[in-house]
Amino acid sequence: MAKYICAKCGYIVETDKLSDDYVCPMCESGNDEFKLVTNDIFDQDDLDSVIDSVVEEALEIKTSKIVNDTVEDKKVRISQYNPAIVRIPEKCINCGQCKKTCEKVVNLSYDLNVCKNPICLGCGQCILNCPTGAIVPRYCYKDVKGIINTNEKVVIAMIAPAVRVSMGENFGMDPGENTEGKLVTALKKIGFDYVFDTAFGADLTIMEEVAEFAARLTNKGPMPQFTSCCPAWVKYAEVYHPELLDNLSTCKSPIGMQCAIIKEYFSKEKNIDPSKIVTVAITPCTSKKMEAREYTINIDYVMTASELSILLKEEDIKLNNLNDSEYDKLLGEGSGGGVIFGNSGGVTESVIRTLYRIMTRTNLKKDQLVFTDLRGFNGIKEATIEMNNYKLKVAVVQQLENLEELLKDGRYKKYHFIEVMNCKGGCIGGGGQPLCQITQLDKIREQRAKGLYNIDNKRTVRFAHDNQELKLLYKNYLRKPLSEESFKLLHTSYSDKSYLLRGEEK
């Protein structure tokens, strides 16, 4: 398998041979604009040549605009009210990379003249592909630090799985290296009162999602069941495919569940006034900022990995020099299955592990835990899993352009369970991750994914249903998955937002 890079926009394609009629999905350049990359890790010259050509063209446009005011505005529209991302106008060179990414990679299309307002999933892929750093997450880290400094609130952080294998990149560590112990130490140094693992929330999601799936399977509910932990995908479904909303799992995302449990259960156990609690989710994902504002009221702040890197440097905390600390108890650690939520296919693997236990009353053996067909970076992955008298067909989709392939001609209907992630590689490729050379993105995603699988392999507890703290939560408070208490705190509903495409008011 060879890698080719587009000299105009930096898009990378992996194929045995580039066909003569190949067209770049980003900038629509032909085959002649691609060059073969001979080294595994792209060198600086590769990146410089791409950026130089993009910048040179953009500067020519800027210069011509002084004379001609009718020059095309190539950048993607970002509303001033966008909760996830913002543009720094002074850095923008109108190269069009953001718009190409949004249209060709994220697969968003709409008529702005009709819509009146831009439609954004908040995924932040434009951030990763901007050559000048003109688009950034909407920062909240200064607000969080200000709250901590008042000493009036109980501030609680949760570390998402994908963050622990990326944070070291800004501190001289290798992509994929597990920094979770050092992150706990760093967050306590900053002043957080409690630090939890979002993998606990992922385990909770698994318990509820598997119970929901089993109920649909036995009661002939709407099938297939789609996952709902990626907020960018959820919004895409609401806007572009409202016909699928009955098929979406009603489960909140892991941080949505965990924040609800913190304010309802943890507060009582620790005798803390819920109004005094401030929850801060540390995520690889800018779209989680949108989720916090539009979908889940219990998430107070979402701080991306890239933001946390800035905060640590401002506080002169060198992550690579810190000792490891443990998560706080009660809602602390998660299983290995919860950790691999950060990879494309990880949710499905975790679901299979627990569904197998429910349907057969036995755990999968250690050598049965890895589902190779569901791993890797193919746009659509599928497998058939046999349990008792069922042959369950599952599919894993990364990037929404691939989802459209699955939806064509009702092809998706042959599956029982479909996982969808907006970003390539899943959460490890999120728009809030530390920046790197555009041409090295794929290599770094692979290293991060490997890091999460390594953590899972080393965990003593690898099944969500074997998480002891989770068992206590159900015993003492929730009773069982899909209980009245669970539905109240852990489940949600969706609404048809296709009116946005028509420029209509709700």
Regions inferred by a protein language model and the residue ranges of each:
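Non-ligating segments of multi-cofactor redox enzymes
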Residues: C9, Q44, D48-V76, V155-I156, ...
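Short, charged low-complexity linear segments at domain edges
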Residues: M1-V13, S64-A84, I93-D111, P254-A260, ...
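Intrinsically disordered, low-complexity polar segments enriched in Ser/Thr/Pro and acidic
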Residues: S49-V55, T101, V105-D111, C423
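Iron-sulfur-associated redox domains of electron-transfer enzymes in respiratory
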Residues: P137-K506
